[in-house]
Amino acid sequence: MKNYSKNATHLITVLLFSFVVILLIIPSKCEAVSNNMQPLEARSADLVQEPRYIINVPPRCPPGSKFIKNRCRVIVP
């Protein structure tokens, strides 16, 4: 009977320890989630950069060819 009580004591100790660890971990996880729950405008305000002006510049073609209809075409003399 002594062996069973020793196992039960060990089991209760392990369960209590894991319960305390869970109580310590859960609040930190909830805090991280609440920080992430800010409105999208507040979070994306830091990420917004000034708009870049896109200039449509045709690609450079190799010598002897011209850019015609979105492609480099070889001009035959």
From Swiss-Prot:
S-S pairs: C61-C72
Chief place where the protein resides: secreted
Origin superkingdom: Eukaryota
Transmembrane segments: none
Expression sites by tissue: Expressed by the venom gland.
Alphabetic keyword roster: Disulfide bond, Secreted, Signal
Signal peptide: 1-32
InterPro entries in the cross-refs: Secapin (IPR020128)
Propeptide stretches in the record: 33-52
Cellular component aspect of the GO annotation: extracellular region
Location relative to the cell: Secreted
The protein's role, per its UniProt record: Nontoxic peptide.
Family from the record: Belongs to the secapin family.
Protein name per the record: Secapin
Native source species: Polistes hebraeus (Paper wasp)
